[in-house]
């Protein structure tokens, strides 16, 4: 099994020979530890730094740098909102974001993982939705670097006061999104 352990920057991958590709949907590109089958049929394992989304076009390598694999975003069922009225598209994005929906925003369209309830909301706002198969590359969150999708909640500093509540949170409910804020934990 090939152990893919490192991400390559664009500069690092320039001039390297591509071994094969790895096509994954978004639900698997958010994982850092994963057994996969490369597009050429070889078995591989991802052993990457936690909390970073794999983006289409990004290259991975093994410890020796001998194997270079390019990630491809798989086509998956998505809802795409195309709109020439940028104010309407902005309003739709606002309402989707208000529901903590991972959202891909591009010039003239927005895309999210298909959900008929969200589709009905978009139509109710005056938009139109096309359900299609397409790669899904959501925006990195405001508290995340553009390189990844996870978050870290470091809380090592002294507040100068005490609390009778915990500053920890659980990732047990994958449907909940946690956003760390100083002294509070807001969950959806």
UniProtKB/Swiss-Prot annotation:
One of its GO terms (biological process) is urea metabolic process. It comes from the Bacteria. This is Urease accessory protein UreE. It is found in: Cytoplasm. One of its GO terms (molecular function) is nickel cation binding. Its main location: cytoplasm. InterPro entries: UreE, UreE_C_dom, UreE_N, UreE_N_sf. Involved in urease metallocenter assembly. Binds nickel. Probably functions as a nickel donor during metallocenter assembly. One of its GO terms (cellular component) is cytoplasm. Residues 157-172 have a biased composition (Basic and acidic residues). Keywords: Chaperone, Cytoplasm, Nickel. Belongs to the UreE family. Residues 142-174 are annotated as: Disordered. Coiled coil: none annotated. The gene is ureE.
């Amino acid at each position: 099994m090939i152990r893919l352990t490192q991400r390559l920057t664009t500069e690092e991958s320039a001039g390297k020979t591509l071994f094969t590709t790895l096509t994954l949907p978004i639900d698997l590109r958010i994982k850092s530890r994963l057994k996969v089958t490369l597009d050429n049929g070889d078995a591989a394992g991802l052993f990457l730094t936690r909390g970073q989304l794999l983006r289409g076009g990004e290259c991975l390598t093994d410890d020796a740098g001998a194997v270079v694999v390019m990630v491809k975003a798989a086509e998956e069922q998505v809802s795409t909102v195309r709109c020439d009225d940028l104010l309407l598209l902005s309003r739709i994005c606002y309402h989707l974001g208000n529901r903590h929906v991972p959202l891909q925003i591009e010039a003239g369209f927005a895309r999210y993982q298909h959900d008929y309830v969200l589709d009905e909301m978009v139509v109710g706002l005056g938009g139109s939705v096309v359900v299609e198969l397409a790669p899904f590359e959501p925006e990195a969150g405001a508290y995340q670097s553009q390189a990844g999708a996870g978050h870290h909640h470091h809380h090592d500093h002294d507040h100068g006061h005490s609390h009778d509540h915990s500053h920890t949170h659980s990732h047990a409910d994958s449907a909940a999104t946690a956003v760390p804020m100083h002294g509070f934990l807001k969950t959806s």
